[in-house]
Amino acid sequence: MVADVTVASVAAVLVTASFPCYLYGAWIIIDAETVTWGTLKHHLAYIFAGLALNTVPVVAWMVPQLFDQLGGFAVLHAFFGVQAYALLAFALTGIVPILRAKREYNLYHDPDQDVDLDEIHENMSDWRLRLRAGVIGYVLCWLVAWVLGVARFVTKYRTEF
């Protein structure tokens, strides 16, 4: 059987590798003058890659081991990890209606229309606020969970290296 430290190391590398995907995905949107459908798909490819790199170790290895390790860092690490995913779900309550409204106005395929986003739907500013709050909250909770996870890794496996 594979040693626990090996599996933990692979999980740590995969979760850590997700962060550059998030950063580059964010940069694609920040750098775009207008967000076309192609830009959005390019952005989402990196975001989904980051989510996959992060979620697979969580579901396959961390969650099954959590109840055997409850205490201190493990509880905090799990708490902030769950909060990160909860805030991601909150962000989705903003992005889904935004996507629907922008597609209705054909703003992804014809982005040159002179339309203020807040004018295409009465709730657009609320949806955009949900999206921003959810994404910022996800990233902040993810970073705290990552730091706690690294601290747990170092304290648990430092004698095995």
Q: Residues of each region from the PLM?
A:
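Juxtamembrane boundary at the C-terminal end of a transmembrane helix
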Residues: 146-161
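Alpha-helical transmembrane-segment detector that highlights a single hydrophobic TM helix
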Residues: 62-99
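A generic, lipid-embedded transmembrane alpha helix
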Residues: 42-67
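Short, strongly hydrophobic alpha-helical membrane anchors
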Residues: 1-6, 159-161
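Membrane-interface helix-boundary motifs at transmembrane edges
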Residues: 30-44, 70
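N-terminal signal-anchor/start-transfer transmembrane helix
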Residues: 11-32
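Short membrane-interface loop/juxtamembrane segments of multi-pass integral membrane proteins
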Residues: 108-131
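Membrane-water interface of transmembrane alpha-helices
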Residues: 20-26, 89-112
